Amino acid sequence: MGLGARCVVPEANNSNKEIKINPNIIKESIQMVKYASSKNKVYLAILGISWFWFIGAAIMAQIPSLTRDTLGADENVANLFLAVFSIGVGLGSFGCSYIFNNKITTKYVFIAALGISFFGIDLYFASHIASINYAPEQLKSISQFLSKSHYWRILFDLFCLAAVGGLYVVPLFAVMQYFTSPAYRSRVIAANNLINSFFMAGSTVILSLLFYM
């Protein structure tokens, strides 16, 4: 699918033919981040995107534990959660072009962030209520899981959280690229990916410390 999508992406021209490749990866990475941080709107967008990946990494990491230890369900239910989350992000991202009418705007980013918080909190309470019926001697299958109405609330929260996440992050990506000079755009995107990875790693470290405590 990725290769197929690549084939229909319009070819981009070289915006800076005089660019020199620095073989020192660390030094060049620092320079890319410095340049990105010097552009206020761009850097704020990158931080917002990184926060999205921070939360996303935390949620994805907790799904196996949530499924088995809290809800008492098997790995097929965990796969269902992952599928629902992925579909939600995809639909939310796809819906941006219709909701924003193909305009670059952060008008609803704050509302989407509130939506992530709301559905995240409700997911916690829904999971807590559902855990009351946890039977440790037998893990629930998908059919058993879907047969109870209170489990559908968990799926709904997870889907909506992912969907508003898509509505949140896509406008920030658009802002990051729009306010970056074409000559630096690819390097700013690389800097964004680097900062994203640090946030995701930080999410993993924090979760590990909380688990240890």
Give the role of each language-model region.
Residues 91-108, 211-212:
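Helix-to-loop junctions at the C-terminal end of transmembrane segments
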Residues 114-147:
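C-terminal ends and interior cores of transmembrane alpha-helices
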Residues 179, 183-211:
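A late C-terminal transmembrane helix in Major Facilitator Superfamily
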Residues 34-91, 109, 113-117, 166-167, ...:
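A single, central transmembrane helix in multi-pass transporters
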Residues 11-48, 70, 135-147:
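Juxtamembrane intracellular "pre-TM" segments in multi-pass secondary transporters
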Residues 75-76, 106, 152, 182-192:
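Loop-to-transmembrane helix entry/capping segments in MFS-fold secondary transporters
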Residues 166-180:
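Intracellular juxtamembrane helix-capping segments at the cytosolic ends
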Residues 1-15, 123-127:
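C-terminal membrane-cytosol helix-exit motif in multi-pass small-molecule transporters
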